[in-house]
Regions:
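Catalytic-pocket segment enriched in acidic/His residues
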Residues: 36-167
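Short beta-strand segments in beta-sandwich/barrel cores
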Residues: 11-13, 143
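N-terminal accessory regions of nucleic-acid-interacting proteins
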Residues: 13-27
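Short, structured patches in soluble enzyme cores that scaffold and shape functional sites
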Residues: 2-10, 28-33, 63, 81
Length: 167
């Protein structure tokens, strides 16, 4: 999942939406990798285990400071798998806007400098990664990052891409 990541500054708690910018150091790209079968087999209520393996949340290629992004809710996000465009959306299509995310997270916990929030995606154009793939994410104004996928078990899955409820 190609997502915008928020790099936080703190410590802060209870940040209202109108003050969301004071909680943000900057923005970067994150590939939110999921081992969906692992998540489903280990915990019925969700997939947190399937998102918790080493290397499953690569960040980069840089951190743009918050003043360099005029509107984090209007950025083009693209994801390629081995050169094929799989996923493209605008951050205005995320389920929750950045001010709402900051308000919600800080209502639950104190955020500290360096904490990162993955903002989510629109869930269309998702598909499996396999050994030998090159996963690339690009976010408008932030940059482009490439990751070489390595699976020592050399597993493979059908190359189906989820394109919404009718796919």
């Amino acid at each position: 999942e190609a997502e915008l990541a928020i790099v936080l500054k703190g410590p802060l708690k209870e940040v209202p939406q109108v003050d969301y910018k004071k909680a943000i150091f900057g923005y970067t790209c994150i590939i939110d990798v999921s081992a969906r079968a692992q998540g489903r087999s280990t915990w019925r209520q969700g997939s947190w285990m399937g998102k918790s393996f080493d290397t499953f949340a690569p960040l980069g290629p840089c951190i743009l400071t918050s003043d360099e992004i005029e509107d984090p809710n209007d950025l083009e996000v693209r994801f390629w798998n081995s050169g094929e465009l799989y996923h493209q959306y605008n951050t205005n299509d995320m389920e929750h806007r950045v001010p709402e995310i900051i308000e919600f997270v800080t209502s639950i916990m104190t955020i500290n400098s360096g904490d990162v929030i993955a903002c989510g995606t629109n869930h269309e154009g998702l598909g499996p990664l396999q050994d030998g793939d090159i996963a690339e994410i690009e976010i408008q104004g932030v940059g482009r990052m490439s990751v070489n996928v390595s699976d020592p078990l050399k597993r493979s899955w059908p190359r189906e891409i989820y394109m919404g409820p009718n796919s």
